[in-house]
Amino acid sequence: MSVLQKPRGVKDWYGEELIYFNWTVHQITNLAWKWGFSEVKTPLLEYAEAFKRTNANADIVKKELYEFHDKSNRLLALRPEATAGIVRLVCENKLLQPQNYPLRLFTIGTMYRYERPQSNRYREHYQFSCEVIGDTNPTVLLDTLLLGHAIIQQLGIEGVILKLNNLGNSATIQQWNQALQAYLTQFKAQLTELSQSRLSTNPLRILDDKVDGQLPFISDAPQIEQFLDAEQQALNTWLQQQLTQQQVPFEWNPTLVRGLDYYTGVVFEFVKDDTTVLAGGVYDNLVEELGGTPTKALGFACGIERSINCLSAVKKQAILANQPPRLLVIGLTEAALEKLLQLSLGWRAYHPVTIYPKVIRIINGIRAAQRLGYRFLGVIGGNNLEQQTITVKDLATEQQTTYTWDEFRQRQVL
């Protein structure tokens, strides 16, 4: 019988990769708590309408959505992103109370997109998502951008640039779309089939296309600044001043758009080389579109796999070096092994203790510890039983120390 394989586009987590994963998640969620965010959990399954109502023209809905009818013929979908689910949670559970504004919520979990698997792009992938619901004033916006910057700094990812644009609002986006449609139609024959289809539905996405976005006539296309009012332009100026003062490397990109249809106002991406590590923006209409009252909101998502891939080799070495020390204990006799089982319950309050499951000689115990990745080896033999002691050997330095059982139980010795 052949070995069962995992589905294409998903990833197993184990060993060092899982250590990097847990470290990355801990760093990000710890910062979210420091910024005043509270954690929520939403289901992997939502009604497909939650995504189709808000992103009808987005690729993640038109091409990449995992959707199916259940046995009751209800159309469900695996979530491709977290924002719609969080907003649905807020609306359904009536969390939109003025005394709660703004809500600061975050979640972390798996997202699903049926796209061609490639480097650091998986059909099942992990995202950290945070949302501020109830206010998007300049201070809230800047504070959220600074959280994104702090995440990049905390992870030690170098060479990251914050790219921003201001889409204004629904009216300015519509005006920009119309102007782009009129301008790009004259170049329709030079566009790919995908971009030609977007001309009538969402021409903004042509600017973001990896192929057509590089065509020479794109640089002369209408830009959003032509349609922004004085207040929106003033926000752009203020943001750039504040980011400069905060020493956040940034670049104002007037052609930047996001792949999700619900974004309005400021959109942004933290980019390393050609990899977007963290991205988001303002979405002032989404809450109303999902059944709530008109409510301003903004948020961003950070890809965990991409973040891990951007960690330097030095950072990864430091993460591994800072893991809690692990101890393998062996019994040289049956009586010693039996005693270890009794003692280990108290010891584990202070030390991660793994018991080797059978009687073994010291030299073989050292080899087993090295093979299994343990730095410390604890030994109990006949003399240790009589003296009620354990000998602990540091395999990295080859130093060894003998402790009484009570000493080893009552204090941190590794």
UniProtKB/Swiss-Prot annotation:
It is found in: Cytoplasm. Its EC number is 6.1.1.21. Coiled coil: none annotated. Keywords: Aminoacyl-tRNA synthetase, ATP-binding, Cytoplasm, Ligase, Nucleotide-binding, Protein biosynthesis. InterPro entries: aa-tRNA-synth_II, aa-tRNA-synth_II/BPL/LPL, Anticodon-bd, Anticodon-bd_dom_sf, His-tRNA-ligase, HisRS-like_core, HisRS/HisZ. The keyword Cytoplasm applies. Its main location: cytoplasm. GO terms for cellular component: cytoplasm. The keyword Transcription regulation does not apply. It comes from the Bacteria. One of its GO terms (biological process) is histidyl-tRNA aminoacylation. GO terms for molecular function: ATP binding; histidine-tRNA ligase activity. SUPFAM superfamilies: Class II aaRS ABD-related, Class II aaRS and biotin synthetases. It catalyses: tRNA(His) + L-histidine + ATP = L-histidyl-tRNA(His) + AMP + diphosphate + H(+). HAMAP family: His_tRNA_synth (MF_00127). Belongs to the class-II aminoacyl-tRNA synthetase family. Homodimer. This is Histidine--tRNA ligase. The gene is hisS.
